[in-house]
Amino acid sequence: LLAENFPFSTWSRLLRHTISEKQQLLLTQSPTAGVAPLRQAIANHLRHFRGMDISPEQIVIGAGTEYLYELLIKLIGRDKIYCVEDPGYQKLRRIYRDNGACCIALPIDQQGMSVTALNTVSCDVIHISPSHHFPTGIITPISRRYELLGWAAAGPRYIIEDDYDTEFRLVGRPIPSLFSIDMSNKVIYMNTFSKSLASTIRISYMVLPKPLMEEFNNKLNYLSCTVS
């Protein structure tokens, strides 16, 4: 992002307004999952842009997706087997392994990760980017998305849906997110503002299914929010 393309005048105006009008909020410690106004704004955005009918209380905010990945490993468990896409985001494998979790890289086909490949290994959690796979750009069709949801619903499994780069399209609207069509509370949705605003703005978020959010509040409420 070039400096001349960033709306610094608008950014400065909003900062001045916030400092002037939200002084008490700025001096109040954020809850573990993040400040309520930001979570509400994200919920409104996802409802409008991604058709996700969610509560702000399901949203967890963190300083970068790497931090949120580590939270998920703490929440779901280091004893689980995590599968990632091959090819894919190389840093993911290191994050899982450095946090003591078993990570398997599964080859993808022309529609993304397949249930056929998943059935060849023992796997508890898959981590995928169905709306814009990196580095191939593959978009997982709706039929494959339902197959993956069926896989997750068949056992104690989860899908981590990284909705990377979905804001940028030449025409039309994106295919519905896995989270928005999931009926079994098995999808964890993740996104970040580093692409839509700037890479130096380290604000990312995840949306947890309600049962998993309850577990998050019980297990990880001692942590401080990394975004203030």
Residue map of PLM features:
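Short, histidine-centered active-site or binding-site loop motifs used for metal coordination
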Residues: 1, 129-132, 194, 220
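Conserved N-terminal helix/loop that builds the PLP phosphate-binding region
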Residues: 1-22
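Short catalytic/ligand-binding loop motif for oxyanion handling, primarily in non-cytosolic enzymes
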Residues: 3-7, 134-136, 167-168, 199
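Short glycine/proline-enriched turns and hinge-like loops at secondary-structure junctions
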Residues: 7-8, 170-172, 181, 199-201, ...
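Conserved core of the PLP fold type I
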Residues: 15-156, 166-168, 173-181, 188
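Walker B catalytic acidic pair
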Residues: 162-163
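PLP-dependent aminotransferase class I/II
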Residues: 188-228
